């Protein structure tokens, strides 16, 4: 059973070959940058530059290599919406973490 079939089977209230695995298919099932870098280290992979899903929450999008390694069944779509389309220009790297300053100057 492939990922698509697995998910559709589960959504149809039938039993798939295994429980579908979602990691970062949405912001709510995402992984923070710190946890992701720790995961990469645990798997013996090199650190990666973060690809942000939600900067304010420090949620990153895992690389396809990691998603395949972990056999994740889902892939997320993260369009830049009106609330976060300019978020990258408001980021500063302060060494061990990123700082986000919103339009009111709050971090």
What does each of the following model-derived ranges do?
Residues 1-107:
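Catalytic cores of TIM-barrel enzymes
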